[in-house]
Swiss-Prot record:
This is Aliphatic sulfonates import ATP-binding protein SsuB 1. The complex is composed of two ATP-binding proteins (SsuB), two transmembrane proteins (SsuC) and a solute-binding protein (SsuA). GO terms for molecular function: ATP binding; ATP hydrolysis activity. It comes from Burkholderia lata (strain ATCC 17760 / DSM 23089 / LMG 22485 / NCIMB 9086 / R18194 / 383). The keyword Membrane applies. The keyword Magnesium does not apply. The lineage of its organism: Bacteria, Pseudomonadati, Pseudomonadota, Betaproteobacteria, Burkholderiales. Its EC number is 7.6.2.14. GO terms for cellular component: plasma membrane.
Amino acid sequence: MNATTSAAAYGLLAGADLEAELAQARVADGDARDAAVLERDGSASVVPLARRRPGSPVSDDAVTLSGVSKRFGARTVLDNVELGIARGSFVAIVGRSGCGKSTLLRLVAGLEQPSSGALETRGEGGGELDTRIMYQDARLLPWKTVLQNVMLGLGRGARDQARAVLDEVGLLERANDWPAQLSGGQRQRVALARALVHRPQLLLLDEPLGALDALTRIEMHALIERLWREHRFTALLVTHDVQEAVALGDRILLIEQGRVALDQPVPLDRPRARASAAFAALEDRVLKRVLAGGPGVSDHGAPHEADNVRPVGQIRWAV
């Protein structure tokens, strides 16, 4: 199912830093200079090419976490997290299993509440931030057609809108098919369409491509990136795949033992050239940092405290 907070008007991208980053010159395979910068800056938290320029405006954050901690009983899963997610940006979160990645996503979604600290979400114009989640399991209703799955919660008047979004994900011709007739990648495209038909301001992606084959994952990367640039939503991706994080993110966060251990901007032009020296150097750097850290706390084995979990009745689901 796809969870959402209260709906707010969908607005335009506000993020001068993102536009400036996307305007950087393309990093080509033979650009040894940029690759060397990535290689030699291994001890820094960010690479020089991505640092904020003097006098540049402060980001308009869609999500802000101030001293946020999350505990399940005596176990601390997130510990005093300080984080801002700029509106319109694409942030990828990586880390070992159980480090707190999915817990962070659930907090941002409003599915659970922080044990301490403050988490603020802001929609366009100061309103509420409409949020949708896409999971590894597409969670389609098998007794409804593809079109009906996309239209869930919208009513008959949204048929044209749903068909338009199906066309965007390349599945309009499968509108009357059943989910069982689709491949895994096609089912995830339907799940993506079901989220985007609501025109969310924030799209949360909880390892949505983890069960797909390598070629289908690359195709989905291109689709998600294209739709992100067209729809201008903020995206927060949780993934175990460092290459996926470099391919999609403007910024990569490493969660390690409940804390943000690395905040790495990605100073590469889009679409990302996976074979480039700079791409490979950045991927290698982040991967080495992930492997250097010890195992984190468990996301899955921790008991949930009832007073920290939002009741189901307070969450609006788009299934």
